Amino acid sequence: MQYYWYPRARYNIDPGDRYNTAEVYVGVRYDQFTAKYSYALTNLFGMKTGTIGGYCGIGADGSAATTNCLGTGSSRGSGYLDLAGTLDVAVGVSLGLHYGRQYVRSYAPLSYADYKIGLTRPFGAVSLGAAVVGTDAESRFYRYTPTTAGSQETENVARLGFVLSASKTF
């Protein structure tokens, strides 16, 4: 079981509602491959009628969309499937693969698949990596408007990305 706790974080629309989420999960591992399924016992990050029901998203121009809006209801029972693997492709070089599928109950347009394909290589005590990450999430629901006063620009956080990393295990 895992619990996501966001102290003092609440929705502005319905201030009593929080983002906190409880999930139970089961996973299996075979050699270098893993599969895990997480099931939400609570509303997924607080999503329900009073917090996001009826929301239509943000258009590329920063204006509120008015069609194809979200439904209503509880998001309890949402789930996430996580498939991953690591393969040695050369001496000291590993290929990491990930595919995930988020299902959001009652709010199907928020459901998405995500993926990551990357290479890592240790250099002494540090591992360096490079990866391509992406998703098929509907951009109108995964945009944010910067907090700059008067700004109408939006950022699509559901687009293809490239990640460079450096990590050290203690």
Model-derived regions: residue spans:
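Residues that define the transmembrane beta-barrel architecture of outer-membrane proteins
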Residues: R18-A22, R29-D31, S75-L81, S111-Y115, ...
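Sequence/structural signature of outer-membrane beta-barrel proteins
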Residues: Y3-P15, A40-M47, G100-A108, V133-Y144
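Outer-membrane beta-barrel "beta-signal"
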Residues: R121-V126, T154-F170
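Solvent-exposed loop segments that connect transmembrane elements
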Residues: Y11-I13, G46-S74, S139-V157
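Repeated loop/turn-to-beta-strand initiation elements of outer-membrane beta-barrel proteins
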Residues: Q32-Y37, N43, L87, V91-L97, ...
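A mid-sequence, solvent-exposed acidic-amphipathic segment
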Residues: G59-L110
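Conserved anion-binding
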Residues: D17-Y37, L41-G46, G50-G62, T66-N68, ...
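Residues on the lipid-exposed face of transmembrane beta-strands in outer-membrane beta-barrel proteins
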Residues: M1, V24-Y30, L81-L87, I117-R121, ...
